[in-house]
């Protein structure tokens, strides 16, 4: 017998209150934040898996409910129609959430099975027909598609996080292959960097170069090979010199003409914030810590000043973009103990969870309870990042609870 949505939410609420699966609190005690957030991460993750999964292909749909007439705007040229399964970028979002959940001991056994499935899914995007080998935007079994350097950076990060979680050498090998593909796009125009996608030389964006920086640094983290540290520093230095704006945040791209495109998204600063923290940890050079702390402050101030609803701490330009910024705040907290930025994003996320979920338990794009948004299909990436955020918050709160 299928539970009604209202009753299902009631059951979920009981599980949170009781601390089910996350440590039973003593009678009369409220559950600890780490347990609440882990429960929400589990619920979000399982909801995505149940609703978006396309069993025939072992992949996921772009939206739920699936609406194949939808037009996707995040590809070169725009106006691409929704297809049978999702593009690589939203698929990667679920892989990233899995990697974070793997860090929680109680979730490891279950998440290893999900990881196996996601690795198989990731490989359907791998294109071996062109040289060098890289990952294209849509599974090769359906069509030939563009190969984006930022997508490949995400694949590299996902595989390195999976390697750091499991020490499976296959994942390390694949991350190295991805990084070789990214380096094939590096040239000395505009002083270095890579473009957005293979064969298009109109811009060098923060998204491609920021994710390349992190891929290199995570490869160094896993191998201690100075080759990857040197490349991480090279990408970082190019970004810092070429795309850091006078506002203190990172601009979207530099055009082939050399003109700076002063459009600002949260994730472009987030990737560089995490990179600065990693460089500080790897080198001990305090300039990186200083740059990280300044970027954390400037990014929060900048996006808090942008128009946004009162319940949100900053402008939610895209939930996944904010998730990448949160990764940077998370990394910085672990080296300097400054929790203020994490706390403010957490408060916004909690508002979205409590007020802005639709009849299927899926969160709106703006994190606000807008009736039109509540009625619309929800994008896979917007939901996968909710699971990642709550998994990260659960880990952070668990550490804070043990220190009290």
Regions inferred by a protein language model and the residue ranges of each:
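Bacterial Sec-dependent N-terminal signal peptides
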Residues: 1-31
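CBM-like carbohydrate-recognition segments
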Residues: 31-97, 101-113, 117-150, 204, ...
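Short coil/turn linking the two alpha-helices of tandem helical-hairpin repeats
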Residues: 102, 106, 163-167, 220-224, ...
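Extended ligand-binding groove/face enriched in aromatic
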Residues: 112-222, 226-233
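Amphipathic alpha-helical segments of tetratricopeptide repeats
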Residues: 183-184, 221, 240-241, 281, ...
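Active-site cradle of extracellular carbohydrate-active enzymes
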Residues: 206-212, 216-220, 227-276
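Oxyanion-binding "anion nests"
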Residues: 268-283, 288-304
């Amino acid at each position: 017998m299928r539970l009604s949505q209202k009753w299902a939410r009631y059951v979920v609420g009981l599980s949170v209150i009781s601390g089910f699966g996350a440590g039973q609190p003593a009678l009369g005690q409220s559950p600890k934040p780490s347990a609440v957030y882990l429960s929400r991460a589990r619920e979000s993750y399982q909801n995505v898996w149940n609703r978006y999964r396309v069993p025939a292909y072992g992949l996921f749909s772009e939206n739920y409910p699936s609406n194949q007439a939808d037009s996707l705007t995040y590809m070169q040229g725009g106006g691409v129609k929704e297809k049978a399964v999702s593009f690589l970028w939203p698929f990667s979002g679920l892989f990233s959430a899995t990697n974070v959940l793997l860090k929680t001991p109680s979730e490891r056994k279950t998440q290893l099975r999900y990881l196996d499935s996601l690795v198989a899914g990731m490989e359907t995007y791998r294109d071996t027909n062109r040289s060098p080998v890289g990952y294209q935007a849509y599974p090769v079994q359906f069509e030939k598609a563009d190969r984006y350097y930022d997508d490949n950076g995400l694949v590299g990060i996902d595989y390195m996080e999976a390697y750091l979680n499991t020490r499976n050498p296959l994942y390390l090998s694949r991350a190295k292959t991805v990084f070789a593909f990214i380096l094939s796009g590096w040239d000395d125009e505009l002083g270095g960097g890579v473009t957005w996608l293979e064969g298009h030389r109109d811009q060098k964006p923060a998204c491609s170069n920021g994710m390349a920086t992190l891929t290199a640094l995570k490869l160094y983290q896993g191998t201690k090979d100075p080759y990857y540290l040197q490349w991480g520093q090279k990408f970082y230095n190019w970004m810092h010199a070429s795309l850091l704006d006078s506002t203190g945040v990172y601009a979207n791209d530099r055009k082939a003409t050399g003109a700076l495109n002063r459009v600002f998204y949260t994730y472009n600063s987030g990737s560089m914030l995490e990179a600065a923290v990693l460089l500080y940890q790897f080198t001990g050079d305090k300039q990186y810590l200083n740059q990280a702390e300044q970027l954390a402050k400037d990014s929060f101030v900048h996006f808090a000043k942008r128009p946004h609803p009162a319940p949100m701490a900053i402008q939610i330009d895209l939930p996944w973009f904010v998730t990448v910024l949160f990764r940077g705040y998370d990394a910085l907290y672990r080296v300097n103990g400054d929790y203020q930025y994490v706390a403010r994003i957490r408060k916004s996320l909690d508002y979205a969870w409590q007020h802005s979920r639709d009849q299927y338990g899926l969160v709106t794009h703006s994190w606000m309870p807008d009736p039109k948004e509540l009625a619309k299909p929800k994008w896979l990436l917007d939901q996968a990042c909710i699971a990642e955020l709550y998994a990260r918050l659960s880990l952070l709160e668990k550490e804070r609870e043990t220190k009290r």
